Amino acid sequence: MATTSSEEFSEVIERATSESIPNGELNLPVALEISDILRSRRIAPKDGMRCLKKRITNTTNNPNTQLSSWKLVEICIKNGGIPFLREICSREFMDTMEHTILKYDDSDEVVELVTTMLYELYLAFQNDSQLNYVSRVYDKLRQRGVKFPEGAPISSNVNALFDSKTPADWIDSDACMICSKKFSLLNRRHHCRSCGGVFCQDHSSKSIPLPDLGIYDSVRVCDNCYDDYDYKKGSGSQGKKRKHRKSHRHATEDEDEDLRKAIELSLRASNSSVEPVIPVVESEPQIPAVEEEDPDLKAAIEASLREAEEEKRRREEHAQQQNTNAYPQQFRPPANELTPADEEDIYLFASLVERMKTRPPSEILDDPQLQQLAQKVFASKPRLGNTLNSKIQKYNTLVDMNGKISHIMNTYDNLLEQELRNINLSERFNVPQAQADPYSQYSQYNQPAIQNNTSQTNNVVNNKPLSQRESEPQYTAPTDSQTIESKAYERQLENLVQPPSNVNNERVASEPPYPNEELNDITSIQLNSERAGKYEENAVPPGSIPYPIENDDQDETTRTKKNDNITNFDFPTVPARKLPENNVEQVEDKPQDSQEEALLIEL
């Protein structure tokens, strides 16, 4: 048995109490279906009560729908069973009934119906301890002066109004109620939908519908309930066999009579319905002179009459087919719209008028067929106006919708263009990625072009082998005048060598700003003069130690201090432009020449 959700149950309630039903009536078959759903417990009683209450609260502004909703509640109360009655008699629903009786002023019929229902519930359950809230609401309304129909005949047999059979509550047990077998993993338990007992598979394998419980699908029942229903069907069928034999003859006759009556009613309805707009016109030549003089007009009129007769014959055949197929109602076009026959009359009248322009007025006035056609066309003028207005309204609506669609499309295109523009801007201004080796960039761009001459000479000396370094004389620190001259020499070299202008990793050798010969001459002369002055001032007499021991210790201590920091490196200078190779060779060869000159001066 399939269950029903609250949404589906609410839809069925709306169909039963539709606003299209006049005078507060309801759809009775759908209402009985709702009561069967409640009685068979396909929906929980509380959920069913809340769906009905929701429909009542949502239709307070419509008296007809409100009346039909309360009528549906009355049917459900009398056919829903005891579990549903308990929810109706609860405080949640009784407060709604009390509020309707006291404060609903739109319809006296609704107030009277709700008052009668409350009084019936009070008479039926005034002695029930579980449903005593009905008595409290009744006493409260009596104190406020509400009048109840106490003298009505409903009080004599009110308990029979709520006597409806419902499925029994399920009983729990550990053994079958017929064979007493214990339930286990293999021997599963099953409940009977009729009596609510617990049975094994062997004694609950049958399934039948239970219409007296509101269950029209085949459900599982036990063997005892199946035998009871089978016996009831057998006893009922034996008593009806004799009556069935006697009434079988009359059944066929009744069917024939009903069919005959239905055909007669359909024929009457078709005759009373709207006749075709163009009736049959008798083709009696009243004015033979006009017909002889105008054969084209005569042929056109005869053709229109033949078409009208064929149209009438086709409609009669169609009506007969509908009657044989048990469709008594015929399709009727709207009264305020043009029919195809009206359109044909208008076109025919227009063509005839165009042809009659050359005829004298007397012939036009004497033609009775043309006069009848003119009357039909003039009678269809209001319908033509209504049709024209409806078409104009539809056209304006479509034009408005087209304008809205175009506006929406333009707005959507602008949004897309803005998004694409934002994406292009974000891609254009992305942050470049950092290089993998930061020291390479530092060595290329952040180092000065040329260091001072002391660092250059030290690098040249350090690159020599150890034996050659020991044979060369040691030098002392330069004086102030020598430092000034070295700084001036550094400025000259910086002016000669320009820093890189563009940030590229490629190093392109460029031509020096001056010819190589002049640059070689200048650098060789300056180096010779400076080193000659150094050796003359710092000449050491024979027999003396060139360097004190303390100075060696100090150099070692300073050298160890510098090496304490691992990252304290003196990176070699990478010039931005290629230096002439002759200068380097001259710098490396000059110390030997200066030594020879110093020895010659001493001699």
UniProtKB/Swiss-Prot annotation:
Protein name, per record: Vacuolar protein sorting-associated protein 27
Annotated gene: VPS27
Q: Where is the composition biased (Low complexity)?
A: 452-463
What keywords were assigned to this record?
Endosome, Membrane, Metal-binding, Repeat, Zinc, Zinc-finger
Asked if Transmembrane helix is a keyword of the record, the answer is: no
Q: What residues does the VHS domain cover? A: 18-149
Q: Which residues bind Zn(2+) 2?
A: C192, C195, C222, C225
Instruction: State one molecular function term (GO).
Output: phosphatidylinositol-3-phosphate binding
GO-annotated biological processes: ATP export; cellular response to nitrogen starvation; microlipophagy; positive regulation of protein maturation; protein retention in Golgi apparatus; protein secretion; protein targeting to vacuole; protein transport to vacuole involved in ubiquitin-dependent protein catabolic process via the multivesicular body sorting pathway
The species is Candida glabrata (strain ATCC 2001 / BCRC 20586 / JCM 3761 / NBRC 0622 / NRRL Y-65 / CBS 138) (Yeast)
Q: Which cysteines are joined by disulfide bonds?
A: none
Give the membrane topology. Answer: Peripheral membrane protein
Domain comment from the record reads as follows: The FYVE domain is involved in the binding to phosphatidylinositol 3-phosphate (PtdIns(3)P) which is required for the association to endosomal membranes. Both IUM domains are necessary for efficient binding to ubiquitin.
Q: What does this protein do?
A: Component of the ESCRT-0 complex which is the sorting receptor for ubiquitinated cargo proteins at the multivesicular body (MVB) and recruits ESCRT-I to the MVB outer membrane.
- InterPro entries referenced in this protein's UniProt entry, alphabetically: ENTH_VHS (IPR008942), HGS/VPS27 (IPR017073), UIM_dom (IPR003903), VHS_dom (IPR002014), Vps27_GAT-like (IPR049425), Znf_FYVE (IPR000306), Znf_FYVE-rel (IPR017455), Znf_FYVE_PHD (IPR011011)
Into which family does the record put it? Belongs to the VPS27 family.
Main location class = membrane
Instruction: Give the subcellular location.
Output: Endosome membrane
Question: What interactions and quaternary structure are annotated?
Answer: Component of the ESCRT-0 complex composed of HSE1 and VPS27.
Can you tell me which residues bind Zn(2+) 1? C176, C179, C200, H203
